[in-house]
Curated annotation (Swiss-Prot):
It is found in: Membrane. The modification N-methylphenylalanine is found at F8. Keywords: Membrane, Methylation, Transmembrane, Transmembrane helix. NCBIfam families: IV_pilin_GFxxxE, PRK10557.1. It comes from Escherichia coli (strain K12). This is Prepilin peptidase-dependent protein B. The gene is ppdB. Not yet known. Its main location: membrane.
Length: 187
């Protein structure tokens, strides 16, 4: 009486186990590198998001610079030094003047780079002094460059460009450059 054989032979099982072991070892060596690259990419994206958020914030204020719903005296935009400090004035409440008091409702705002940190001050009248608030976290981000450049073109409103270069403090090789231009229609 014939006996039907079913299943795998011992040799086939051993060969299958050897092949799967080689594949598993290859995957085990590849996985940490994949996780490291994923973490590096995530950190760079977080740094880019942070820097672009700051650049857009400054650019928004630059675009509003000089707006006045009445008769305002003074300059709507003051770029100090090499462009690493900027003071912007605009009539936020449309009352026709650039309010200086109270400071919490002042129509002036300043941005400056000091000791690799972007800082801001509501009611700023100069780039010196104390009381400036840190906009970036110095324990996480090192701002190498913050610069506002004004380009005057005859017959047109000036173009204002915000340039920022930053690095991650934990990974200094992770560097982000951001540059964004707006038109100063009120200047």
């Amino acid at each position: 009486m014939p006996v039907k054989e079913q299943g795998f032979s011992l040799l086939e099982v051993l060969i299958a186990m050897a092949i799967s072991s080689v594949l598993l070892l290859g995957a085990a060596r590849f996985l940490p590198a994949l996780q490291r690259e994923s973490l590096t990419s995530t950190r760079k994206l977080a740094l880019e998001d942070e820097i672009w958020l700051r650049v857009f914030t400054v650019a928004k204020h630059l675009q509003r610079a000089g707006y006045c719903h009445g008769i305002c005296t003074g300059e709507g935009l003051e770029i100090v030094g090499q462009g690493d400090c900027v003071i912007v004035q605009w009539d936020a409440n449309s009352n026709g003047i650039w309010d200086r008091e109270p400071v919490k409702e002042s129509d002036q705002i300043g941005f400056r780079l000091k000791e690799h940190v972007l800082e801001t001050l509501r009611g700023a009248t100069s780039c010196e002094g104390k009381g400036w608030d840190k906009v970036t976290n110095p324990d996480a981000i090192i701002i190498d460059t913050f610069q506002v450049v004004r380009q005057d073109v005859s017959g047109f409103s000036p173009v204002l460009t915000v340039n920022m270069r930053a690095a991650s403090k934990s990974e200094p090789q992770t560097v982000v450059n951001a540059s964004y231009s707006v038109t100063g229609f009120n200047l």
